[in-house]
């Protein structure tokens, strides 16, 4: 059986890079993308420079995937941005950028992936939300709105793609050691952790374990679901 082809967005650093290396170790053929160049490479890994909110770039990337592999088994919509500001201090340009990457990007990648996946009547799509949604975190209005939209999008795409053997699920990580939260005051992180049933920082492996579950062929009866990590 051919090794599965897995596309992961936002693979330059952080969770995305960890997931890319994780699935390479598991024998996947991994395709990654990011707006900026990566400073790493691995056997079996192919990287594209693409903004997930740029429809032309996304379509070009999928044309290359189709030519190179003829298939796509998994899509992990990891790419995301945040801006932690009070709403009164957040410019519209920031809101538009967050929505473009987190919502439009997730939609575009999912749409194009489903076109390729439906040929084989099989596919797994995993989106990324955040515990910021159920916790309704103040100071992150645009980010929370975008990640709420991802949850809603997951529900609808799960229904639309089910007839093609494609499942669509979502993982909502809590605080992780990424660039997104390094500028957040420790007191705010501590208050957030206190609201979790398991009051600790998450790890990249915690995220990978959840994504593993959603990607398994045996998870074919699970779709439209969001798992928030840490117990919120």
Walk through the language-model features, giving the residues of each.
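Active-site helix of classical SDR
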Residues: 110, 146, 154
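Conserved glycine-rich cofactor-binding loop
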Residues: 12-13
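Residue(s) in the substrate-gating loop at a strand-loop-helix junction
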Residues: 130
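C-terminal substrate-recognition "lid" of short-chain dehydrogenase/reductases
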Residues: 107-110, 122, 200-229
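Substrate-binding pocket helix/loop in short-chain dehydrogenase/reductase
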Residues: 86-87, 91-99, 181, 192
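Active-site loop immediately N-terminal to the catalytic Tyr-X3-Lys motif
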Residues: 88, 135-141, 163-164, 199, ...
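Alpha-helical segment proximal to the catalytic Tyr-Lys
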Residues: 115, 159-163, 220
């Amino acid at each position: 059986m051919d090794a599965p082809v897995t596309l992961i967005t936002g693979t330059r650093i952080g969770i995305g890079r960890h997931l890319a290396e994780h699935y390479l170790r598991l024998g996947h053929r991994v395709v990654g993308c990011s707006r900026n160049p990566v400073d790493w490479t691995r056997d079996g890994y192919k990287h594209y420079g693409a903004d997930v909110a740029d429809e032309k770039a996304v379509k070009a990337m999928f044309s290359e995937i189709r030519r190179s592999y003829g298939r796509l088994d998994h899509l992990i919509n990891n790419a995301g941005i945040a801006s932690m500001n009070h709403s009164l201090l957040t410019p519209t340009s920031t809101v538009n950028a967050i929505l473009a990457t987190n919502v439009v990007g997730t939609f575009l990648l999912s749409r194009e992936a489903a076109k390729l996946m439906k040929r084989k009547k099989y596919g797994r799509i995993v989106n990324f939300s955040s515990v910021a949604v159920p916790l309704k975190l103040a100071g992150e209005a645009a980010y929370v709105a975008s990640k709420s939209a991802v949850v809603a999008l997951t529900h609808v795409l799960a229904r639309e793609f089910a007839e093609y053997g494609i499942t669509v699920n979502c993982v909502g990580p809590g605080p992780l050691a990424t660039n997104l939260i390094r500028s957040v005051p420790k007191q705010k992180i501590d208050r957030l952790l206190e609201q979790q049933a398991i009051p600790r920082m998450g790890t990249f492996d915690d995220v990978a374990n959840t994504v593993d579950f959603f990607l398994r062929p045996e998870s074919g009866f699970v779709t439209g679901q969001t798992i928030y990590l840490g117990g919120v």
